[in-house]
Amino acid sequence: MQEIQKNTKKEQYNLNKLQKRLRRNVGEAIADFNMIEEGDRIMVCLSGGKDSYTMLEILRNLQQSAPINFSLVAVNLDQKQPGFPEHILPAYLEQLGVEYKIVEENTYGIVKEKIPEGKTTCSLCSRLRRGILYRTATELGATKIALGHHRDDILQTLFLNMFYGGKMKGMPPKLMSDDGKHIVIRPLAYCREKDIIRFAEAKAFPIIPCNLCGSQPNLQRQVIADMLRDWDKRYPGRIETMFSAMQNVVPSHLCDTNLFDFKGITHGSEVVDGGDLAFDREEIPLQPAGWQPEEDDTSLEALRLDVIEVK
């Protein structure tokens, strides 16, 4: 009995520690990019996956102690996919006492009509979903739209664009929407996916599977995700350093003439950002810059979330 109580206390301690880390990550992202302001009404896009559940939970937690006042409204888009458990999210949100709206739109039918069998439907589905969410934000009077993309998503997008698109472009933590009317924020931008997985598992969120539409996952993104996971396992700190690099760009040492005036460099020009160090012996730190291992990182092997069995 004492052993059980000891394990329970340890689990609660670890959960509290994990929640504090996620809360700190979200708080830093909000502050760095001015994501939330006084009086904001945040539309939290809730898909039923681990990321959006975690985002809602951490924002609710921050709402209680933040120095500014803001409100939350959770929104789920029921796309009429076969087997979608439409009772799960309303029951969960009512239990929490969170304001919410379920938007019912048969985008599944539209996608099936337009896309040949066996082809990836994600692109069209995403465009349809985006338009509906923008419209819903206007109807609800939301000042910001919050999406659940995390640090790993941002890095994956960067490498996808580098490897397949020939450009250095990631996923912005804050942006103006396609229609020019809404500000979109990603509060989980600094959060690690493995932290989100552990948190969702500990909180026992009622996870809804994301493949009810039958669409195949993006193979290119999967390749990138596997590569980054392998690097994270074999070279601790590399992921953190790469993400830091996204926040520490030196345009004068790249090759984009739109970002730096290379043609304007003439005799007498000032040295910019250290000049040319290509022939110097660089001092590379033994540990990745700015990386500190977390105490509980050794327990992160092969974590998976159970999802609700849809009958």
From Swiss-Prot:
Principal subcellular localisation of the protein: cytoplasm
Q: Where is this gene product found?
A: Cytoplasm
Instruction: Provide the alphabetized UniProt keywords.
Output: 4Fe-4S, ATP-binding, Cytoplasm, Iron, Iron-sulfur, Magnesium, Metal-binding, Nucleotide-binding, RNA-binding, Transferase, tRNA processing, tRNA-binding
Q: Which InterPro entries match?
A: Rossmann-like_a/b/a_fold, TilS/TtcA_N, tRNA_Cyd_32_2_STrfase, tRNA_thiolation_TtcA_Ctu1
Q: How is the cofactor bound?
A: Binds 1 [4Fe-4S] cluster per subunit. The cluster is chelated by three Cys residues, the fourth Fe has a free coordination site that may bind a sulfur atom transferred from the persulfide of IscS.
Q: What's the EC number here?
A: 2.8.1.-
Q: Name one GO cellular component term.
A: cytoplasm
Question: Which is a Pfam family this sequence falls into?
Answer: ATP_bind_3
Q: Where does [4Fe-4S] cluster bind?
A: C122, C125, C213
Q: Which GO terms describe its molecular function?
A: 4 iron, 4 sulfur cluster binding; ATP binding; magnesium ion binding; sulfurtransferase activity; tRNA binding
Pathway given for this chain reads: tRNA modification
Q: Name one GO biological process term.
A: tRNA thio-modification
> Which function does this protein serve?
Catalyzes the ATP-dependent 2-thiolation of cytidine in position 32 of tRNA, to form 2-thiocytidine (s(2)C32). The sulfur atoms are provided by the cysteine/cysteine desulfurase (IscS) system.
Family membership noted in the UniProt record: Belongs to the TtcA family.
Q: What else is known?
A: The thiolation reaction likely consists of two steps: a first activation step by ATP to form an adenylated intermediate of the target base of tRNA, and a second nucleophilic substitution step of the sulfur (S) atom supplied by the hydrosulfide attached to the Fe-S cluster.
Q: Subunit arrangement?
A: Homodimer.
What name is this protein filed under? tRNA-cytidine(32) 2-sulfurtransferase
